[in-house]
Amino acid sequence: MSIKSDRWIRHMAEEHGMIEPFSPRQVRHVEGNSIISYGLSSYGYDIRCAGEFKVFTNVRSVIVDPKNFSEHSFVDFTGDTCIIPPNSFALARTLEYFRIPRNVLTICLGKSTYARCGIIVNVTPFEPEWEGYVTLEFSNTTPLPAKIYANEGVAQVLFLESDEVCEVSYADRGGKYQGQSGVTLPKA
């Protein structure tokens, strides 16, 4: 298994639609303003989150149960920034849509810019032949409110190509998050 370079990522995005929309370079400024970078890097791709969020709240005193997760645990929010309450979390989705090849596994890691502020992005794989918008989780580990930015870099995806094709892909087994189009809550 090997990590894939910028050349391979660019080719797969431009010729096979692996990442849409795709930025072929690191973007660090928009309209003269500094932003948290996104786009193609040497051995990965920095993704953005869209401006739709679900912010966790316990105002309804529900129990957090991954087998029976209540939508009432979240407040929906749309905007260019999202404030996460202290010691809480928010869900968002990527701006980019992914189509992962059958012989590739990706790993999504948080950006150090956010980690240095106590905001942690979940580590998650995108399995072979998975496609959709990625649901991201941002944990605010601080005792203070924390801000995340839509349309700016939030995490990096690394692409690992196997030396052989898997017998059963995510699509073959009918994975429960296949083709997700928005922020998707846990499914058992």
From Swiss-Prot:
Keywords for this entry?
Hydrolase, Nucleotide metabolism, Nucleotide-binding
Kindly indicate whether the keyword Nucleotide-binding belongs to this entry.
Answer: yes
Q: Which residues bind dCTP?
A: 111-116, 135-137, 156, 170, 180
What's the EC number here?
Answer: 3.5.4.13
For biological process, the GO terms are: dUMP biosynthetic process; dUTP biosynthetic process; nucleobase-containing small molecule interconversion
The residue range of the signal peptide is none
Give the CDD domains listed for this entry: trimeric_dUTPase
Q: Which InterPro entries match?
A: dCTP_deaminase (IPR011962), dUTPase-like_sf (IPR036157), dUTPase_trimeric (IPR033704)
Q: Which reaction is this enzyme known to catalyze?
A: dCTP + H2O + H(+) = dUTP + NH4(+)
What superkingdom heads the lineage? Answer: Bacteria
The active site is formed by 137 (proton donor/acceptor)
- Give the GO molecular function terms: dCTP deaminase activity; nucleotide binding
Q: Which HAMAP family match?
A: dCTP_deaminase
User: Tell me, what does this protein do in biology?
Assistant: Catalyzes the deamination of dCTP to dUTP.
Annotated family: Belongs to the dCTP deaminase family.
- Quaternary structure annotation from Swiss-Prot or TrEMBL: Homotrimer.
Q: What is the designated name of this protein?
A: dCTP deaminase
What species does this protein belong to? Acidithiobacillus ferrooxidans (strain ATCC 23270 / DSM 14882 / CIP 104768 / NCIMB 8455)
Q: Which gene encodes it?
A: dcd
